[in-house]
Amino acid sequence: LARYKRAKNLDVFFLTGTDEHGQKIQKAAQACDKSPIEFVNGVVDKFKTLWNDLNISHDDFIRTTEDRHCRRVKKIFQQIQENGDIYLGEYEGWYCVPCESFWIESQLKERKCPECNRSVEKVKEKNYFFRLSKYQKSLLEHHEKHPHFIQPESRRNELLQRIKSPVEDISISRSAIEWGIQVPSDHTHTIYVWIDALLNYITALGYDDDMQKFQKYWPASVHIIG
């Protein structure tokens, strides 16, 4: 897609990178008798070699362990917290380590992850939560006003059904995981990997440091998920 757009003389910023934090990485490193950073360094080298062999010409390759990313994630977390959208609560439920996903009892069959069919772990811990429920109405309005925002149609319908159902606040920190970005105001917590990792799309564009570049390329014209 980036090659096609460049061939049409359009200004393209193609971003890729690696998601390097979380319990899955921590456990994989332990199994290899390596520190987490040693483990991810080896994996990143393989990815970069692969992209080169495939002639994939990205404009930036961001690692979520880089200082530019970690620093900006902390800043964004603080901004959300100052806006009153983060609070400390307690999570009790099921967690899939390979998928790094939380599940409730009703979503499980024989206590297997709905995504990968592996066994899930029972978790009970203090977490920071994001007030997603506060934005249910605005999310629904956005998707109804922009019918082509998500494609294909089947995925759009799936998401709309989830938004129309009761929307729960989501856990955005872990108190039992050391390998991650620390919550700025509470170093006993690390920021949940799916919050940390997904923010790379804007941290790589210089959010809060290089706003000229950020405003030039964000929001993204195309965001491929999968």
Regions found by a protein language model. Name each.
Residues 1-16, 63, 68-72, 98, ...:
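Structured secondary-structure scaffolds
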Residues 1-87, 100:
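N-terminal Rossmann-like or analogous alpha/beta NTP/dinucleotide-binding catalytic cores
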Residues 26-28, 107, 205, 209:
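Hydrophobic alpha-helical membrane-insertion segments
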Residues 79, 95, 102, 112, ...:
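The −1 position to Zn-ligating cysteines in a subset of zinc-ribbon hairpins
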Residues 84-90, 120-122:
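A short alpha-helix-loop-beta-strand transition element characteristic
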Residues 90-92, 109-110:
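Short metal-coordination and nucleic-acid-contact micro-motifs, chiefly zinc-binding Cys/His arrays
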Residues 103, 119-120:
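Cys/His-rich microdomains that often coordinate metals
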